[in-house]
């Protein structure tokens, strides 16, 4: 009986997984079973951290806006600024407000003064 040559499908799948894990350290980039386990863990972590990154940036923007608004007035805070923005129907998101607060504080002062009028 003649010898049957194996197909290429499994080898192609494993090389694809190895390319994904080529930057991992130690056995995580060499052994097929640990490569697949680490790939699963890596993909789970990236999906979880995508949502976490959104939360972290939103917290950072809120902190920056709050710091700048409290510098100017004693009783004025982030929550009052956002409330006044909604009352005046000014559509500025927190990312833009934080960039304005860092780069040009005078502009944020004028915005808050116009809102309070």
Curated annotation (Swiss-Prot):
Record's keyword terms, sorted: Chloroplast, Plastid, Ribonucleoprotein, Ribosomal protein, RNA-binding, rRNA-binding
* CDD domains found in the cross-reference section: Ribosomal_L20 (cd07026)
Of the GO CC terms on this record, one is: chloroplast
Q: Which InterPro entries match?
A: Ribosomal_bL20, RIBOSOMAL_L20_CS, Ribosomal_protein_bL20_C
Any one GO molecular-function label of the UniProt entry: rRNA binding
User: Which subcellular locations apply to this protein?
Assistant: Plastid, Chloroplast
BP GO terms, sorted: ribosomal large subunit assembly; translation
Q: Give the disulfide map.
A: none
The free-text function statement in the UniProt record for this protein reads: Binds directly to 23S ribosomal RNA and is necessary for the in vitro assembly process of the 50S ribosomal subunit. It is not involved in the protein synthesizing functions of that subunit.
Q: Which family does it belong to?
A: Belongs to the bacterial ribosomal protein bL20 family.
Q: What is this protein called?
A: Large ribosomal subunit protein bL20c
Species: Calycanthus floridus var. glaucus
């Amino acid at each position: 009986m003649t010898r049957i040559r194996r197909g290429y499908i499994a080898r192609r799948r494993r090389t694809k997984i190895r390319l994904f894990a080529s930057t991992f350290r130690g056995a995580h980039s060499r052994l097929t079973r640990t490569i697949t386990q680490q790939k699963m863990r890596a993909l789970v972590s990236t999906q979880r951290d995508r949502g976490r990154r959104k939360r972290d940036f939103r917290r950072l923007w809120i902190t920056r806006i709050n710091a700048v608004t409290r510098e100017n007035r004693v009783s004025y805070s982030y929550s009052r600024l956002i409330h006044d923005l909604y009352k005046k129907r000014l559509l500025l998101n927190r990312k833009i407000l934080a960039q304005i607060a860092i780069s040009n504080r005078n502009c944020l002062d004028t915005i808050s003064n116009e809102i309070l009028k």
